[in-house]
């Protein structure tokens, strides 16, 4: 999911993450992720993922100054409103009472599991030696890995981190985590 996020919004410059490793499992795995990302443009983003809920809801919400997009299952809800920045500056109270907006819902057919499609296209590209089959170039994956590494580092150290992350510090952290895991009692 981070790869789709990064593909849509680009790389943040900073992030802070909370990851309770092993919350739902007896081993160190990222069962939940809460990541707050910051961009030099002033944009912020929240990324929340959990494997510990039965509802299996996939949802992406994008809120800007002119619209809100909400993607849930096979429905895209678009709420277009007057410019929020102007509304905030001119409205007497913090209320949406006088905010003018329109709403639209777009339903589409539910497609196959996205990762299945990505793997199929990767296999086609590999077999045909044709990058044109790919959804995105392989180098794009490095950005997702940097986000993941930054989130792990932030969560383990309890600090906000700048991106790109220092590879030497990240390797030291991973080496320590691997050693700790080797010495952890078996459950």
Residues of each region from the PLM?
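A general structural signal for well-ordered alpha-helical segments in protein cores
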Residues: 1-2, 115-120, 148
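Rossmann-like dinucleotide-binding domain that binds NAD(P)(H)
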Residues: 1-44, 49-55, 61, 139
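Short, hydrophobic alpha-helical segments
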Residues: 9, 119-130, 149-156
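Short hydrophobic/aromatic-rich beta-strand segments that constitute the beta-sheet cores
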Residues: 17, 47, 71, 78-80, ...
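Short, solvent-exposed polar/charged micro-motifs at secondary-structure junctions
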Residues: 24-29, 57, 145-147, 171-176
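C-terminal glycine/acidic-rich active-site capping loop/insertion
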Residues: 34, 39, 66-139, 161, ...
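A short beta-strand motif that forms part of the nucleic acid-binding face
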Residues: 49-51, 64, 75, 167
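A contiguous, mid-protein "functional segment" used to position or interact
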Residues: 134-168
